[in-house]
Amino acid sequence: KSTREYKLLNMINQKNWFESIHQSNPPKDIMFGVLNKRKKLIGVTGLTYIDWKNRNSEISIYFSTKNWQAKPEAKEVINLIMEYGFEELNLNRLYVEIFSLMKENVKLFKKMKFIKEGQLREKIWRQNKWWDTLIFSKLAKEYKK
């Protein structure tokens, strides 16, 4: 639907991906499970496409619930992954690529003071039409404010 995955998400592909992220050194992806207060897994988040030389990475977030962006946990998860990326890994730039049809995601990252860097016109085909993708980022110096 509105996921950026281009491969079918099934157990075999997920297992292969999970094994591959543990084989690269330094890692190009670092992922974490997201638990609710009852310790139930409700999603995953992490840093993907980590560019160690240029110190930047994409933030990935997948939740099992609809409208996760409106939940208080959404901001908490983004704040934690920013803290990890900027403070623990000493990255300079974290970014997200969001489909323009995912209006709640756009709203959330704007609210979190990510800066819109660009727009890739008609990059994806969903719901029988072309959609743009939007790039938002935050720099380490903006995070520390």
Feature roles, as predicted:
Residues K1-E19:
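Conserved GNAT-fold acetyl-CoA-binding loop/helix
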Residues E19-G33:
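A short helix-loop-beta-strand connector motif used in the catalytic cores of GNAT acetyltransferases and
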Residues M31, L35-K145:
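Acyl-donor (CoA/ACP) binding surface of acyl/acetyltransferases
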